[in-house]
UniProtKB/Swiss-Prot annotation:
Recorded GO MF terms: calcium ion binding; channel regulator activity; enzyme regulator activity; myosin heavy chain binding; myosin V binding; myosin VI head/neck binding
Entry-linked SUPFAM superfamilies: EF-hand
Protein name: Calmodulin
Lineage: Eukaryota, Metazoa, Ecdysozoa, Arthropoda, Hexapoda
Keywords: Acetylation, Calcium, Cytoplasm, Metal-binding, Methylation, Repeat
Length: 149
């Protein structure tokens, strides 16, 4: 996981890590983790922080060493990429850029992808993703659809 980071990213993470490793013993406390991540432009929620800490802090001693920190940051960066990919996919479908995917836009893109769908099939796809029932798919609904397993 950490091997997907550039040397520049690793150096940047090391610098941030060191700023919060007050006594220089090579570990930071879980409380300091949120501050470190925010200094690197990430904005994790408390629940996300707790999840990350639980995943990384194998011995449960409340501190995180640098290799653990690198693994965690690499995971977080990977997640950010997929969010950007979803946003890009939404833009492809949202032809007129109004923030919604209509049945006509969905049909157009699916046809370009070689999928010949009936009006009923297109309407069904919209209905499945259309959480608020307004007949079109907004970005939040699209994300939900794309990220649900």
């Amino acid at each position: 996981m950490a091997d997907q980071l550039t040397e520049e990213q690793i150096a940047e993470f090391k610098e941030a890590f060191s700023l919060f490793d007050k006594d220089g013993d090579g570990t930071i406390t879980t409380k300091e983790l949120g501050t470190v991540m925010r200094s690197l432009g990430q904005n994790p929620t408390e629940a996300e922080l707790q999840d990350m800490i639980n995943e990384v802090d194998a011995d449960g001693n409340g501190t995180i060493d640098f290799p653990e920190f690198l693994t965690m940051m690499a995971r977080k960066m990977k997640d950010t990429d997929s969010e950007e990919e979803i946003r890009e996919a939404f833009r492809v479908f949202d032809k007129d850029g109004n923030g919604f995917i209509s049945a006509a836009e969905l049909r157009h893109v699916m046809t370009n992808l070689g999928e010949k769908l009936t009006d009923e099939e297109v309407d069904e796809m919209i209905r499945e993703a259309d959480i608020d029932g307004d007949g079109q798919v907004n970005y939040e609904e699209f994300v939900t659809m794309m990220t649900s397993k």
